[in-house]
Regions:
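Canonical Rossmann dinucleotide-binding motif of NAD(H)/NADP(H)-dependent dehydrogenases/reductases
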Residues: 2-35
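Catalytic loop of short-chain dehydrogenase/reductase
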Residues: 99-100, 132, 136-177, 188-191, ...
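Hydrophobic positions on the long internal alpha-helix
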Residues: 76, 91, 118-122, 126, ...
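C-terminal helical subdomain
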Residues: 185, 204-259
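Conserved NAD(P)H cofactor-binding loop of Rossmann-fold oxidoreductase domains
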Residues: 93-98
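Rossmann-fold cofactor-recognition segment
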Residues: 51-69
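Substrate-binding pocket helix/loop in short-chain dehydrogenase/reductase
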Residues: 100-108
Length: 270
């Protein structure tokens, strides 16, 4: 089992929703410091103030950062590393679900392009074979990555499927043996968050689809999602995938993901 005690963490999209809940759970578990990266300065300063009051001023730091601007993202990494000497954990949580014609490219930029840049920077700084001391990267995918969704949030689903594939690939045992950096994917079910509240689509029926989906899968709280993420951190192997839905404990679904890849690749090398 892996411990969070005395670890230094970065959480992107940490100003509200699931990200803020993760920050709180990490602090309750005894992390040394959490850097909150978010573009929302008002919410970021607010959560920083709340957490500092409860856990101490040195335990948390808000850094205004648009993760799609690589210079800002890398500067946040360097600032955290220079202040604490190292980074142990990165949670790539920043994301949106907006598929309106003028927004779908930003959904891709935030959900996958920026997440990839953050993942690679974390890997560069942590990897043991390049002078680091190992660590853990947790990438937030979604239950949408496991489904063929109706054409309402299919771009969002595609970005989350890409996140899942990236994380599973980087987490392969043969690669982890060299880097000592775990990569873990978390697939959340419907969760009350800004993404949930601000769902956007080119399809005008999005609200009707949302209502149907909620009946099938009642939304869980961000706090439940964060508890599931901590469980995955403590017990997950590199390359593992965890499902957190319906307000139930986190489930390791790695064997199912691996089986799916086996089926899909059956005839490739014949």
């Amino acid at each position: 089992m892996f411990s969070l005690k005395d670890k230094v963490a970065i959480v992107t999209g940490g100003a509200c929703g699931i990200g803020a809940a993760v920050v709180k759970e990490f602090l309750q578990e005894g992390v040394k410091h959490v850097a909150i990266l978010d573009v929302d300065e008002e919410s970021g300063r607010s959560i920083e103030k709340q957490m500092a009051a409860n856990f101490g001023n040195d335990k948390v730091k808000f850094i205004k950062c648009d993760v799609t601007i690589e210079e800002e993202l890398l500067a946040a990494y360097e600032k955290t590393s220079s202040n604490y000497g190292y980074i142990d954990i990165v949670v790539n949580n920043a994301g949106i679900a907006d598929e309106r014609p003028d927004m779908f490219k930003r959904t891709i930029d935030i959900n996958f392009t920026a997440l990839s840049a953050s993942t690679l920077k974390a890997l560069e700084m942590m990897r043991e074979d390049k002078g680091g001391h190992g660590g853990t990267i947790i990438n937030i995918s979604s239950i949408a990555a496991l489904l063929l969704v109706a054409p309402t949030i299919f771009i969002y689903a595609a970005t989350k499927a890409a996140v899942l594939h990236l994380t599973c690939s980087l987490g392969k045992e043969s690669y982890f043996a060299n880097t000592k950096v775990r990569t873990i994917a978390i697939c959340f079910g419907c969760t009350i968050s800004d993404i949930y509240k601000r769902l956007g689509s080119f399809d005008e029926n999005i609200e009707k689809v949302k209502e149907i989906f909620i009946k099938i899968m009642p939304p869980q709280t961000a706090e439940v999602a964060a508890i599931g993420l901590v469980e995955a951190y403590k017990n997950g192997q590199s390359g593992s995938t965890w499902l957190v839905k319906n307000s139930k404990p986190a489930i390791d679904i790695t064997s199912k993901i691996n089986k799916a890849y086996e089926i899909l690749s059956e005839n490739i090398f014949e």
